[in-house]
Structure formats: structure tokens, C-alpha cells
UniProtKB/Swiss-Prot annotation:
Protein name per the record: L-type lectin-domain containing receptor kinase S.7
Family per record: In the N-terminal section; belongs to the leguminous lectin family. In the C-terminal section; belongs to the protein kinase superfamily. Ser/Thr protein kinase family.
Positions glycosylated per UniProt: N45, N279
Organism: Oryza sativa subsp. japonica
Catalytic reactions on record: L-seryl-[protein] + ATP = O-phospho-L-seryl-[protein] + ADP + H(+); L-threonyl-[protein] + ATP = O-phospho-L-threonyl-[protein] + ADP + H(+)
UniProt modified residues of type Phosphothreonine: T376, T386, T403, T657
Expression tissues: Expressed in roots, leaves, lemma, palea, pistil and anthers.
SUPFAM superfamilies with a match to the protein in the record: Concanavalin A-like lectins/glucanases, Protein kinase-like (PK-like)
The EC number(s) this enzyme carries: 2.7.11.1
Residue intervals of the Protein kinase domain: 389-661
Length: 695
């Protein structure tokens, strides 16, 4: 057996991709055992540090923001460590000539660097022994610390190997120019660098391939504008022994920094795998490669040869040609007739099931609405109040797609009429909102329900009219009057009181799921009234958390809710925390690419918290109240949902009757762990090939 066949071909495959797999890849996956792979998205199993954040729709990871504000560096790591070194005892049994055996590895990723308007330092693929350390900006790409003694102490036990995609010339760091690729082996001073053959700052997707062959002690890097055609010749080829830097387990991921520039560093697609451990009891058993072949169509290292087996029995003599033709004819005829019969059954069955589904949904809606009691006003009254639902009376659109009209009832009361179509998701939103409002009828900080009605094609909710619009418009309308601090503080306190009521005091717990400034209405006295319960869910006290498709508005959604779809009171608390920071700072959750959470937390770490106050207030606020709102906001957006306070505690902290919760100087990393299930990946010691795919 050739020596190459004695190596284990594949230990670990990690794939993060935002594009559909090819048909060939899909068929190979389908043939693999169900337990040998799982699919994840960018929103799962990642640790985000510094300025790193998920792109809308979890379409990738932004490592930096296109601004000079904030941390300036970001890092995204796969949360589960990867085995890269065989321990000494196992290595000794496999090969007496070496104390430890490193793995070979390869990775492919598609990235995009967009100047805004200037470029930053660049980004890097890295392997690191620390999941929580984030290095410096200003040329260091978030990989290594600056030269301060405190940072050096923090780095003492951290091992890092990185491939730089460098877009900034820093003479002090021995950079050759402002457009190069380089290898860092334990230090920011690169051991090798080269021209990439592409313009790294072009703002277009670029694909990089990195491959390290441990037996040859060589690392190669290719770059191309094409995501599928790897160049024949590598841009960088470095002879380097990484065994002294690799640890038994390390974390794979990306890091970037902006330094004195401002650019958006995005990774859109990522594949990673290790291979090359000698066959031993400590390494996983050989398995088939179940992912797509490498884009350059280079074969993977072959698996070990199978053990000899007895020869198969001699085949029977071939049939006569006429028999073969007749047999083939019957096969084709049977296949055609069988296909036609099957198609007919599918069409008939689909029609029957569709009819049943429609009838069942209509029946379910009728039952749901009937359970809520009789309508409190007629559809004719609702139509008359809005002048026949005249488009000139439209004042907004609800998050569930319902249209909101201003109207006047026969009594002269001004109302907001929310009109749903009696189809699909609109019906569900109507039922959810009506059920929530009937379960929590009385609270001064909820928009009061004045009535409701239904017909065959329309569903209507009627609320008291809020003459001062919503909090979003009051905060962010250009050229308008600045909302004074007294009204802002009262709004934050009012929304906190409303959420505490929904979570703890209603007959059933109500999870709002869409707390944001545009859903906070302002009455005639600028009192805050929380509204729009179209996404709300009702759960009995002590009942299990809700698992749903994540819904709401990006920027306000808790990271664990985006990842798991499990809606709890703590996900509402996170949304409230973002709202509190928005009200105090006058900034939207994400403005010009800057997260208000990251920005305020950075100022808190620099002991400049009150500097986050909205400049339009011109200092006209109570400093203690401003500080209290900002700190309450930060503790509510803690990445670990278990460390967020309940809304009752939030109310007490805001009114000063409870002490503030201690907030760490640095924002803790966002640890997005997978939901445990039977198909979760086994430990690294015993896992077969693992396949990860993001769609």
C-alpha cells in the first residue's frame, strides 16, 4: 500500500456558506449518514468579539464597521475548538520519531473589503488558542496586542497563526506595501509576504484558498475574483513549520481592524477542514468525504485501502440479446406507466390536502375568534369612521402588514383603525394581537383597545388615537423639535412598566417580540404607550419557552433569539435595552454601520459613559438619570441572556429603588451555542467527518 494511503484522509470539515450547494454536493450529502453532518448558519456557533456583527439575514459576518468610531477591531470565531495537534502520548505510539504530530488543514473563504471612504488595515484568517482575546487595531488586524505591558501579559499564553489580507502600508510593521498577503506565525511581523494578484480594496467579492501540508511544512495561499476557479500558481508559498505554534485544540475564524481608516470587512462564505493525522486510536476512524470537492477539482487525500475481502462469485452468463431488448422494453413501459399513475395520485392527493388545509385554517380562525367573544362594534361603524377606508386617512402600516387609518367614531372620539386582510399570516397576526390585548386590558402604558370587528374578508382592531405619533418619529425626524429629556426618561420608564406588566401581571405571560421605538406611541401628554402586538405570543406562567421562526426588527433582536428562535421574556429585555440606549443617545440601533450597543459599551469602558448622551439635548438632562438609563440599557443587552435582569428589576433600577447591576468594562463575547439535539456533533476525540452548511 503506498505511503499516501496510510494517512487518514479527513478528520474535520467546517462549511459556512450563504449560497446553495451544487447538485453534486447535495447528492453526496444525501448519501451520507444523517449523523455525519449538520447545517448551521452564520447566526449559530459563533463567538463575536469587538465590532464584529452579523449581516442582516445572517448572510455573513461584518468584522468591522465603516467608521472610525467604536472598537476598531473585530473577530468572529467558530465556537467549537478544532483538533490540530495529536497529543504527545498518542503521537508517540503512532510515530516514535516525533513527540507530537500536527494536522494539515485547508480553508476557502470569500471576503469583501469596502472602503468608507478610506480603507482600514485589512482582515485575516486565523487559528488561535484563545476564544476571548481580541488584539489591537492600528495595523495589528485584531490579531496581536500593541506593545503595552498589560497587553503582552494578556497574550503570554495565546498562540496565533494567521494569514493576512493586508490593505495598509505600515513601515513600522515591515509591510512591503498596502496591498499584500502575508503569513504571521506567532507575531505581527510576517515570516513571508507576497503580491496577491488582485486588488484587495476593490470592494468586490474575492475568494482565498489557504492550505497547509504538515508533512511538507509548506503553506500556500491563492486568491481570485472567481469563487470556483483557484489559480494554478499560489500567490504566496511559504516553507514554515507550524508544529511549535499549533495547540491540541484551537479556534478557527477571522479578524480585522480599521486603524485610522474606515472600511467594512465582510466574510460571506467559509469552508474549513483538517486532515493528515496518522491512523491511531486517538484519531477518528477513516470516513468518506461528504462535502463538495475542492473548487480546483484537486482530489482529496485518498482514504486508507480497505482490508482484503474474498473475491465475489463468478457472474452468470449474459442473457440472449433478444431477451435483453424485450426486458428493456418492459422496464421502460413499466416506468412510464408507473410514473403516470404516481403523478395522478400526487395531483389528486395535493388537491385533497390543500382543500383540507384551507378548511382547517378557516375553521381554526373561526374558533379562535369566537373564543375571544363577540365583536364589540360593527364593520359598518369602522368603515364610516375611516370614510370607507379612504387612502387619505392612512397613517401607517403595522409590522404584520396591516394598514392603519385615522378615524372618528360616532361619539366623536378619534381612533386608529388597524385593518387586516383575512388571509394567511394577517389572520394569525390579528388573532395574536387581539388575544394579547384581551389578556392585558388595563395598563396606562399600553395603547388602549377601543373595539374590534370581523367580516368574511376583513379583520379590524380599533385603538385610541395617539396624537403625537410614535417615539421613532419624535427621536429621529430631521428638522423637528428635539424631544426633551423629561419626556425621554418618562418614555423609557413607561415601556419598562408595560413590559413588566405583560411578563408578570397578566393572566398569561405575553412576549411582545417586537419592542422598538416605532411601536411606542405617544399620547397627548407624551406618555409612552407600547403597541403593535401582531407578533406577540401568549404563554401560561411556568410554561415552556416558545420556539418560533425569529421575527421582529434587526438591531433589536437578542442574539440567542436569532440563533434558536426561542422567544422568552429575556429576548424582550434585550430589545428594551436597545430601545433605552436609542432614546438616551438619539442613535438608531445601527447607524452608519455602527452598533449603538458596541458604541455605548466602548464609552463605558473608557469611563466616558455620559458622553453618549444625545448632543441635540445640549446638556439639558439630569446626569444621574442619563447615567442610570445608559447602564440599565447595557445590562439589558448583556450577550448572556441569563445575566439580564427581569423587567421588574429594570423598573426598580430606573426609579432608584434598587441598585444598578454591575456592568463589565468590556462587552462580553457573544457565544452562540447550538440547540442541543440528537444530531449534535460528537466530541473531537470520537467524531467522524462533520459537515456544516449555511443556506
Amino acid at each position: 500500500m503506498p505511503p499516501r494511503c496510510r494517512r487518514l484522509p479527513l478528520l474535520f470539515i467546517l462549511l459556512l456558506a450563504v449560497r446553495p450547494l451544487s447538485a453534486a454536493a447535495a447528492s453526496s450529502i444525501a448519501a451520507a449518514p444523517a449523523s455525519s453532518y449538520r447545517r448551521i448558519s452564520w447566526a449559530s456557533n459563533l463567538t463575536l468579539l469587538g465590532s464584529a456583527s452579523l449581516l442582516p439575514g445572517a448572510a455573513g459576518v461584518a468584522l468591522t464597521t465603516p467608521s472610525r468610531d467604536g472598537v476598531g477591531a473585530g473577530r468572529a470565531l467558530f465556537s467549537e475548538p478544532v483538533r490540530l495537534l495529536l497529543p504527545q502520548d498518542a503521537a508517540a505510539s503512532a510515530s516514535a520519531s516525533r513527540a507530537a504530530t500536527p494536522a494539515s488543514f485547508s480553508t476557502r473563504f470569500t471576503f469583501r473589503i469596502t472602503p468608507s471612504p478610506t480603507y482600514g488595515d485589512g482582515l485575516a484568517f486565523l487559528l488561535t488558542s484563545s476564544r476571548t482575546f481580541l488584539g489591537a487595531s492600528n495595523g495589528f488586524l485584531g490579531l496581536f496586542p500593541s506593545s503595552s505591558a498589560s497587553d503582552e501579559g494578556e497574550l503570554r499564553d495565546v498562540s496565533t497563526v494567521a494569514v493576512e489580507i493586508d490593505t495598509h502600508l505600515d513601515v513600522a510593521l515591515h509591510d512591503p506595501d498596502g496591498n499584500h498577503v502575508a503569513l504571521d506565525a506567532g507575531s505581527i511581523f510576517s515570516v513571508a509576504s507576497a503580491q496577491p494578484g488582485v486588488d484587495l480594496k476593490a470592494g468586490v467579492p474575492i475568494t482565498a484558498w489557504v492550505e497547509y501540508r504538515a508533512p511538507r511544512r509548506r503553506l500556500n495561499v491563492w486568491l481570485s475574483y472567481s469563487p470556483s476557479r483557484r489559480p494554478e500558481k499560489p500567490a504566496l508559498s511559504a516553507d514554515v513549520d507550524l508544529s511549535g505554534l499549533l495547540r491540541t485544540y484551537m479556534y478557527a475564524g477571522f479578524s480585522a481592524s480599521n486603524g485610522n481608516g474606515a472600511a467594512l470587512h465582510v466574510v460571506e462564505r467559509w469552508t474549513f477542514r483538517t486532515f493528515g493525522f496518522p491512523n491511531s486510536s486517538y484519531a477518528p476512524p477513516p470516513t468518506k468525504y461528504i462535502g463538495p470537492m475542492p473548487p480546483n477539482n484537486q482530489p482529496l487525500p485518498p482514504p486508507p485501502s480497505p482490508s482484503p475481502s474474498p473475491p465475489p462469485p463468478s457472474p452468470p452468463p449474459p442473457p440472449h440479446p433478444n431477451h435483453r431488448r424485450r426486458h428493456l422494453f418492459y422496464k421502460v413501459l413499466g416506468g412510464v406507466l408507473g410514473g403516470m399513475v404516481l403523478l395522478g395520485l400526487v395531483v389528486v392527493g395535493s388537491a385533497v390536502l390543500l382543500g383540507r388545509s384551507v378548511r382547517r385554517k378557516n375553521q381554526e380562525h373561526a374558533v379562535a375568534s369566537e373564543d375571544m367573544g363577540e365583536a364589540t362594534l360593527s364593520m359598518e361603524v369602522a368603515r364610516a369612521a375611516t370614510k370607507g377606508f379612504d387612502s387619505g386617512n392612512v397613517i401607517g402600516v403595522g409590522g404584520s402588514g396591516a394598514t392603519v387609518y385615522e378615524g372618528v367614531l360616532p361619539s366623536g372620539s378619534r381612533v386608529a383603525v388597524k385593518r387586516f386582510q383575512a388571509i394567511g399570516s394577517c389572520t394569525k397576526a390579528f388573532d395574536s394581537e387581539l388575544k394579547a390585548m384581551l389578556n392585558c386590558p388595563h395598563h396606562p402604558n399600553l395603547v388602549p383597545l377601543a373595539g374590534w370587528c370581523r367580516s368574511k374578508d376583513e379583520l379590524v382592531l380599533v385603538y385610541e388615537f395617539m396624537p403625537n405619533g410614535n417615539l421613532d418619529s419624535a427621536l429621529h425626524t430631521l428638522g423637528g423639535a428635539t424631544l426633551p429629556w423629561e419626556a425621554r426618561f418618562r418614555a423609557v420608564y413607561g415601556v419598562a412598566s408595560a413590559l413588566a406588566y405583560l411578563h408578570d401581571e397578566c393572566e398569561n405571560r405575553i412576549i411582545h417580540r417586537d419592542v422598538k421605538s416605532s411601536n411606542v406611541m405617544l399620547d397627548a401628554e407624551f406618555n409612552a404607550r407600547l403597541g403593535d402586538f401582531g407578533l406577540a405570543r401568549t404563554v401560561s406562567h411556568g410554561g415552556l419557552p416558545l420556539t418560533t421562526q425569529p421575527a421582529g426588527t434587526l438591531g433589536y433582536l437578542a442574539p440567542e433569539y436569532v440563533h434558536t428562535g426561542v422567544a422568552t421574556e429575556r429576548s424582550d429585555v434585550y430589545s428594551f435595552g436597545v430601545l433605552a440606549l436609542e432614546v438616551a443617545t438619539g442613535r438608531r440601533p445601527a447607524e452608519r454601520g455602527i452598533s449603538v450597543v458596541n458604541w455605548v459599551w466602548t464609552l463605558w469602558g473608557r469611563r466616558r459613559l455620559v458622553d453618549a448622551a444625545d448632543r441635540r439635548l445640549q446638556g439639558r438632562f439630569v446626569a444621574d438619570e442619563m447615567r442610570r438609563v445608559l447602564l440599565v440599557g447595557l445590562c439589558c443587552v448583556h450577550p448572556d441572556c441569563r445575566k439580564r435582569p427581569g423587567m421588574r428589576r429594570v423598573v426598580s433600577m430606573l426609579d432608584g429603588t434598587a441598585p444598578l447591576i454591575l456592568v463589565p468594562d468590556k462587552m462580553p463575547p457573544v457565544l452562540l451555542q447550538p440547540v442541543p439535539n440528537a444530531s449534535s456533533m460528537n466530541s473531537a476525540d470520537t467524531a467522524n467527518t462533520a459537515f456544516f452548511s449555511c443556506r
